[in-house]
Amino acid sequence: MSSFKHLSVNQLVQMTEAKSVQIVDIRDGNSFNNGHIDGAFNLNNENLAHFIGQADMDRPLVVVCYHGISSQNAAQYLCEQGFDDVYSLDGGFSAWHEANA
């Protein structure tokens, strides 16, 4: 079984420029609606099964939370569901927002 990898904001920028990544944001809906990384999908318990059924398991998947803590557990869970290339964004949305403000 594979495990997730850590990803810096700079690495995420490079991946998104290459358009080779799926991004899931596990923050609450209000936080997501107030700001999120372009192209991110707001993943929650209600849409998790649908997402897993529709997602490309072979494409890199980046999990984003508030500060990079909760995303680690979610990233490991997604690895266990069959995703091959999963990352947790270090510093979470806060770090991404600071770097892109």
UniProtKB/Swiss-Prot annotation:
Which EC number(s) are documented for this chain?
2.8.1.1
Active-site residues, record numbering mapped to chain: C65
Q: Name one GO cellular component term.
A: cytoplasm
Return one Gene Ontology term, BP aspect: glycerol metabolic process
Record-linked SUPFAM superfamilies: Rhodanese/Cell cycle control phosphatase (SSF52821)
Q: Which domain of life is it from?
A: Bacteria
Q: Pfam families attached here? A: Rhodanese (PF00581)
Q: What is this protein called?
A: Thiosulfate sulfurtransferase GlpE
Q: What is the lineage of its organism?
A: Bacteria, Pseudomonadati, Pseudomonadota, Gammaproteobacteria, Alteromonadales
